[in-house]
Regions:
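Nucleotide-activated sugar donor-binding and catalytic core shared by glycosyltransferases
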Residues: 3-360
């Protein structure tokens, strides 16, 4: 992926010099990770590139000058966006001032579509080429937004294999560059704490690792349902133990409070997600890119994502993809076929689907 992707950014405006300034806009923890790896690869190829913009601590460590750590506002759903709207307006104005006062060679957007649509519009207003790395999943819902993509984005860099054709068929300059998670899995092999991994594997009991998400809002909405599942499993399968893989200390502190109130015996770790995935007998994970990581490790997994009735009703009418889980979307011969599949929990998946999906 890295060689394929970084070559795209070589002199996007046709400049005769390799000195470049690239503005990044990243607002989610996973995007922070992908952005940091992209920045490292770019600086490895040319250390005269200057990276600046919105991102997180990982991008900063990789060499990006942050105007603000936007990952702390990784919000979801319309109401939560409205509550933080004044902040996003301020960040967008800050970006536009920066575009006016500096010579920017390219803008790189990673995920975070609501805010990044605005950044793309402001960048195009100043004649700056815009690259969208990890394009919005317009094929899944609200496909009419493709007009924004055509108008505001110069290059759509796709992480999923079926996305390139979908975007090209709708008039976008698109290229499949591969999913960064698989590069990151290879890199993780060098940083795995083997002693911790060995201790987990040698501890008696079947380890079930809980992965309730990387966004704070996600953890707060999902973890209590994970703990209900733990209660059920403990009651039915005595030879089990549980661990929560927290993205940061704030989420670990939140998890500690819920676990203490529940009376359950669950260990909580920060920064041990790869080890806990590999050591697990199975995992309970929040829906998202983590399913690809678990597929890479061949770890049996149940994907859980709880929404209230209104959100379920809304999603049921807006979502246009056949499946929710990324593993299923990649495996399916036709991820866009709009049919209602129903599986019984005790039956294996049908046709080409490794993870049967059903509402509970």
């Amino acid at each position: 992926m890295s060689n394929n992707l970084t070559g795209i950014f070589n002199n996007p405006q046709g400049n005769n010099t390799f000195d470049m300034k690239i503005f990044f806009s990243v607002g989610e923890p996973s995007g922070d990770l992908h952005g940091s790896n992209l920045i490292r690869e770019m600086l490895h190829r040319d250390n005269n590139i200057e990276c600046v913009g919105f991102g997180g601590s990982l991008m900063e460590e990789a060499g990006c000058t942050l105007l603000f750590d936007l990952t702390q506002f990784a919000v979801m759903w319309f109401v939560n966006v409205l509550l933080n709207l004044h902040r996003f307006i301020g960040f967008a104005r800050q970006a536009e001032r920066y575009f006016k006062e500096n010579s920017i060679d390219a803008v790189v957007l990673i995920d975070y579509p609501g805010f990044n649509w605005v950044i793309a519009k402001k960048a195009k207003r100043h004649g700056i080429p815009v690259f969208y790395y990890g394009v919005p999943q317009l094929w899944a819902w609200a496909p009419w937004r493709i007009r924004k993509m055509r108008k505001r984005v110069d290059y759509a860099l796709c992480k999923l294999p079926f996305e390139e054709k979908w975007y090209r068929d709708r008039g976008c300059e698109a290229r499949f560059v591969g999913h960064p998670f698989f590069d990151e899995m290879e890199n993780q092999k060098q940083t795995i704490d083997q002693d911790f991994l060995t201790r987990q594997r040698e501890t008696p009991g079947k380890l079930v690792t809980l992965l309730p998400g990387s966004r704070q809002q996600e953890v707060e909405g999902q973890l209590k349902w994970f703990l209900k599942a733990v209660t059920t499993v403990q009651r039915k399968v005595s030879d089990t133990r549980f661990a929560i893989a927290s993205f940061n200390q704030t989420q670990a502190d939140y998890a500690s409070k819920l676990v203490a109130a529940s009376g359950l015996n669950i260990e909580i770790y920060v920064g041990r997600t790869p080890e806990l995935m590999q050591a697990a007998h199975c995992c309970l994970a929040c829906s998202g890119s983590v399913s690809l990581e678990l597929m890479y490790h061949h770890t049996p997994t149940v994907i859980l994502y709880h929404v209230n009735r209104f959100r379920y009703f809304l999603g049921n009418h807006l979502i246009r993809s056949r499946y929710i889980t990324l593993v299923n979307l990649i495996a399916s011969a036709n991820p866009f076929l709009r049919t209602k599949e129903v599986w019984h929990p005790n039956l294996p998946g049908g046709e080409d689907i490794p993870m049967p999906e059903y509402p509970t």
